[in-house]
Amino acid sequence: MLDFKPHRPPTTSLILDAASDLFFHHGYGNVSMDWIASAAGTTKVTVYQHFESKEELLLACLHHRLVDRESTLNARFAERTESPACVLDLFDWLEASLKKNKFAGCAFTKTVNEMSEALPEVRRIAQKAKRLLRERMIALAAASGLQDAEELGNELAVLLEGAQVLSLIEHSARPFRTANHAAMKLLTFHGWTPSQEQMGVTLEKY
């Protein structure tokens, strides 16, 4: 599990942040190194001093994004992993993240769609990102004492992925409301008895 944020020199972080944002919102092929340098407040020469090629920068951006995501989730669930409600909280977290990014989709999925043939390593990083999220679902289910935690975690991961894709297509949070309601049913099937308050919150979202 990626459970820390590595120390990065300030200029490296500025370049990674700028490039990650540009690649995510505009696509790899539409973003030039000049644009990245300008967005990072530096020069193209400096960018190349830190990253030998645009491809190397893309891979670094994906790894940077994955480490930051895992660090955020580790902190979010550090002291509250023994309630099935934490599983629903993961759905809430991803919905909030996508809203913040205006339902622009998943950076890993989008990069695989665009670059997996030209740069196969992006698929391996994306697979790792999806695997870590699935394993987190399984771990949360197991810590909560739910039945068949691995099966449940796999089912929830598919729900989460589907909601993410549909939210991009529909440009809406509606798929997450549906997924949250379906997740509640799955959790109940696997042994959770939610309180009336918890049921009310989920139905209200739905």
Regions found by a protein language model. Name each.
Residues 1-10, 191-206:
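N-terminal intrinsically disordered/low-complexity leader segments
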Residues 98-124:
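Amphipathic alpha-helical segments used for helix-helix packing
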